[in-house]
Amino acid sequence: MPRLGAHLSIAGGLPRAVDRAKASRCQALQIFTKSAGQWRARALPPEEIALFRAQVERTGIHPVVAHNSYLINLAAAAPALRAQSLAALGEELDRAESLGLQGLVMHPGSYTSGTEDDGLRLIGDGLAALLAERPLGRTMVLLEHTAGQGTNLGHRFEHLAEILERVDGSPRVGVCLDTCHLLAAGYDLCSDDGYEHTFHELDRIVGLDRVKVFHLNDSKKPCGSRVDRHEHIGKGCLGLEPFRRLLNDPRFAGLPMLLETPKLETPASKRRSDVDPWDARNLRTLRALIRTP
């Protein structure tokens, strides 16, 4: 069976995210280790790191992964932005390492000049340099397959394969698949044939063994739209059947499958629970789709 979970808030400190995950009956967890909309990050106090790791151990929630800042763009051609992006990603990788996280999910980037190939080269070379600077690192970099908005890279399996080739197939680089992004990028998950063809192609081009995490999101937009708009499970263009197939696919048994669906926007002063009602509803929907042995 997959390990279900969600992306949860770190408001109040990193250990509070683990509290929220436990209250929400999550088996796995994704967090930001800093504000996703800022370059700078506060230093993590040793006592907060220790408490977070103890909370994870105590609750048995695993794996825990982080998602990187949306500002980072390794495909940027401008030297200043590229240098800032490399430094920021390196810092986030170090933070994830200190917290004992399995992986750091990252959007590959958007090329700002030149061609797709130029952008993929910059991403791959940048990642290779960051990994070489951290030869003893254990936290994986997880390339997230994207919807392909604008000049975003990573929406074709071939893009991921090219980046992996540029890091010499490092075992420290894996893949995160997002169901909304797959559909938006043109991969048909809605029919039996489309589902099987999608994962056959992924295996042929990238390798199923590279897949370490799934993001489970329905899509507000149809197949091939290349528009990234997440929707609640079963309420969008995917419907329930693709999730039923995925949750019961033995090739992905045991992998974390994490919600990034919309939250109920409730002011902090009015919150009475660590459990987001929409997360709870979406998790119940997913659990009901899992076939019991």
Language model region names:
Residues 21, 67, 85, 96, ...:
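Conserved, mostly hydrophobic/aromatic
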Residues 17-20, 48-55, 88-95, 119-130, ...:
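A general structural detector for well-ordered alpha-helical segments in enzyme core domains, enriched
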Residues 161-293:
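Histidine-acidic metal/acid-base catalytic patches
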Residues 40-48, 76-88, 114-125, 151-159, ...:
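Alpha-helix N-cap and loop-to-helix initiation/capping positions
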Residues 74-174:
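Active-site acidic/histidine proton-transfer and metal-coordination neighborhood
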Residues 1-68, 72-93, 289-293:
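N-terminal pre-domain/capping segments
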Residues 7-11, 32-36, 68-71, 109-111, ...:
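Active-site beta-loop-alpha junctions enriched in small/polar residues
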Residues 19-26, 44-65, 92-100, 128-138, ...:
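Acidic (Asp/Glu)-rich catalytic clusters
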